[in-house]
Amino acid sequence: VRFKGSDYKKGELVVKKNTIIQPNHILAFKSLGIKNIKVKKKINILFFSTGNEISNSDNVPDWKVRNSNNHYIKNLDQNFLFNFKNGGILRDNHEKLFKSKITKMLKSNTDIIITSGAVSAGKFDFVPSVIKSFQLSNYFKSVAIRPGKPILFAKIRGKQKAIFGLPGNPMSSAACFRFFVYPYIQYIFGLNEEKPF
């Protein structure tokens, strides 16, 4: 026998503001007959892999690598509050194409551009120079961590638009997403800061 009000009492808080909705919250909403709640819309992320060596094929020659970073970030979209759009692969000579993609992003509903690779100091690492050609309100490149040292972050002046340049190495890219991109997404949503481990 369950008595009326044994799950929740009248006026009791069900979910705090700035909480990521989880299945247990949906269970509570349905049990209480709550049909509508106010939520913030997901942010939109546009992702580019970079480099002549990147391949979407499963069978790759020795000098190429599989496009794993694209699939990793794509499959985080349900957990990390964003819509993922694959922008494709920017090859080593695609500086102008990348610049045009950023220009289009400024007029679109894209909130964040993420690139993977081409952020270090190599001959074909064009991402930093292209990004710095725009007017920026915030910018940093390289941090004292491993893996992930060559990460880049930029915010376009006068716009709520950001660009992250992640390293091409899969482990470095995953680490930088977790410790830089994800906290930025939390900041956008006004979520509480994570507690240290």
Report each predicted region and the residues it spans.
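Short glycine/serine/threonine-rich phosphate/pyrophosphate-binding segments
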Residues: 23-24, 56-57, 121-125, 174
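Flexible glycine/proline-rich
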Residues: 8, 130-197
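Short, glycine/charged-enriched hinge/interface segments at domain edges or termini
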Residues: 1-87
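Short glycine-rich anion-binding loops that position phosphate/pyrophosphate groups of nucleotides
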Residues: 52-53, 118-124, 168-170
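Short beta-strand segments
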Residues: 16, 47-50, 115-116, 144, ...
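A general structural motif
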Residues: 64-69, 91-98, 142-151
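N-terminal small/polar loop signature for handling phosphorylated ligands or for N-terminal nucleophile
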Residues: 71-135
